[in-house]
């Protein structure tokens, strides 16, 4: 018998012994109460996650495609659960077939996890349709009643039921500092881990993670509101990174943070940006907290009745700080990696999954791309000549669709880039309208701003195609060989209503 055949037989025997120790893929006693997840899905691999009830060995089994639930696994791994990892366990499974649906389960003794499902990405040459959904901004903090203070994460349930190839949970996946009055701030690793467990105690999030592959990313509230290391330090950053990576099967690199890209067939490549690891301090101090420092004087005067401070001129030092080329949002290494990758992409559509709005919104710009004007220009310059780019963003707690412009107001009128952005969410936190109400101390102000500024065409407003600032939900995306369609959807799966009262029409981008 050849050495190769001997090795194959020994490997087969070893897998059989592991499989035999857990039996076929039947269920054991219910366990792993926080569910399962599959992240970083590629054509041939995925990173599978669970949280056990105790330290010690855990067996992960992967079922063959189209097999019954009692079939023997095609992969079986033994992984040791450590208390130092908060009992979370992750394993990269390789050697899978592209474009194939797999199921998986974790075991610890006679206790089994729920069954999870994911579909591997198709080959880069596969001319297939791809469907996915995106949302973010989910606070599970309890209110005075002891129940979640905002809602029960119904948006996640709608996404889980949509039958997507994968989903995206991007930004503010916990709230270390909830907007609910009196909530304690989670600063340590242990406190942040408790926030992740709090979210996973809600069934809709567990359903989302088990239903399909899930790409995850952070924004500020995984650390603290409007976070930058320059302002808040490395200690809370390190705690946020550790807790996030314990609970989200994602890939982090010190040089580029959570930036990475994934190809899904001939027609789609996704680029996930990290907007927190390398950004400079905000320009808020130089601007004295001005509510709209970059808005033209005519726009400021038009809204001075709502916010009297807008009648005052903007200090030049404020504008200089916002436009300073020394300040960055992405950092040089991440920007270079992103620029190289998106310019080299052969996918029909390039989707940039983006932590804060790239479009100009003017109100409170400090934490957005507008507050880092030089880096915004660098990104837009990098995207010049790249065809079929669409930006998907969370963070704003609103549903907005608009073109990314280099200039919205001015003597020559709007100057567009041809790049469209869809902002989606939130899942569970104060909506943008309610935040405007609170900031101005005037209930109903958010709806006024949405209708009077976001919808009218320039120079009277931003001219957004869809503007809804007071509805929970997500963005549903369908990619075909010729079109990319984004439909804003509510927490129940319905179409988001525009502030005008009509349904928000989908964004349809046709391949060029």
Identify the residue ranges that each predicted region occupies.
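Sec/Tat signal peptide C-region and signal peptidase I cleavage site
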Residues: 21-24
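Bacterial N-terminal signal peptides
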Residues: 8-18
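Metal-dependent phosphoester/phosphodiester hydrolase catalytic core
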Residues: 26-512
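Bacterial N-terminal signal peptides that target proteins for export
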Residues: 1-8
């Amino acid at each position: 018998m050849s050495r190769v055949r001997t090795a194959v037989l020994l490997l087969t025997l070893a897998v059989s012994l592991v499989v035999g120790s857990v039996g076929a893929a039947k269920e054991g006693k219910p366990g792993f109460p926080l569910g399962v997840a599959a992240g970083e899905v590629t054509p041939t691999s995925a990173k599978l996650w669970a949280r056990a009830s105790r330290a010690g060995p855990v067996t992960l089994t992967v079922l063959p495609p189209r097999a019954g639930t009692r079939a023997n696994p095609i992969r079986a791994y033994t992984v040791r659960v450590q208390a130092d990892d908060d009992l979370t366990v992750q394993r990269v499974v390789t050697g899978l077939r592209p474009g194939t649906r797999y199921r998986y389960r974790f075991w610890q003794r006679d206790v089994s996890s729920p069954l999870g499902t994911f579909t591997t990405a198709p080959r880069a040459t596969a001319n297939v349709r791809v469907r996915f959904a995106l949302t973010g901004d989910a606070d599970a903090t309890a209110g005075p009643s002891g129940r979640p203070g905002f809602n029960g994460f119904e948006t996640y349930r709608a996404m889980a039921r949509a039958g997507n190839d994968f989903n995206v949970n991007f930004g503010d996946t916990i709230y270390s500092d909830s907007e609910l009055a009196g909530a304690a701030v989670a600063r340590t690793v242990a406190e942040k881990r408790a926030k992740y467990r709090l979210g996973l105690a809600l069934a809709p999030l567990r359903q989302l993670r088990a239903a399909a592959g899930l790409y995850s990313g952070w924004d500020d509230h995984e650390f603290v509101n409007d976070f930058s290391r320059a302002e808040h330090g490395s200690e809370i950053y390190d705690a946020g990174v550790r807790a996030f990576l314990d609970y989200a099967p994602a890939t982090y690199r010190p040089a580029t943070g959570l930036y990475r890209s994934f190809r899904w067939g001939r027609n789609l490549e996704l680029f996930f940006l990290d907007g927190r690891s390398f950004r400079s301090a905000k320009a808020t101090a130089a601007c004295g907290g001005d509510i709209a420092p970059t808005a033209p004087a005519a726009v400021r005067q038009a809204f001075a009745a709502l916010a009297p401070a807008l009648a005052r001129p903007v200090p030049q030092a404020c504008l200089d700080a916002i436009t300073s080329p020394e300040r960055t949002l992405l950092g040089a290494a991440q920007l270079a990696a992103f620029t190289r990758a998106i310019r080299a992409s052969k996918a029909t559509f390039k989707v940039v999954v983006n932590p804060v709005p790239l479009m100009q919104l003017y109100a409170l710009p400090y934490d957005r791309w507008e507050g880092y004007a030089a880096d915004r220009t660098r990104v837009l310059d990098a995207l010049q000549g790249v065809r079929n780019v669409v930006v998907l963003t969370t963070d704003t707690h609103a549903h907005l669709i608009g073109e990314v412009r280099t200039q919205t107001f001015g003597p020559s009128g709007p100057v567009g880039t041809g790049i469209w952005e869809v902002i989606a969410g939130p899942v569970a936190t104060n909506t943008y309208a309610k935040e405007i109400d609170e900031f101005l101390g005037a209930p109903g102000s958010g709806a006024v701003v949405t209708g009077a500024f976001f919808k009218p065409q320039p120079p009277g407003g931003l001219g957004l195609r869809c503007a809804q600032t007071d509805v929970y939900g997500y963005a549903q995306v369908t990619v075909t060989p010729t079109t990319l369609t984004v439909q804003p959807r509510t927490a129940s799966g319905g179409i988001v209503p525009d502030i005008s009262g009509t349904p928000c029409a989908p964004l349809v981008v046709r391949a060029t």
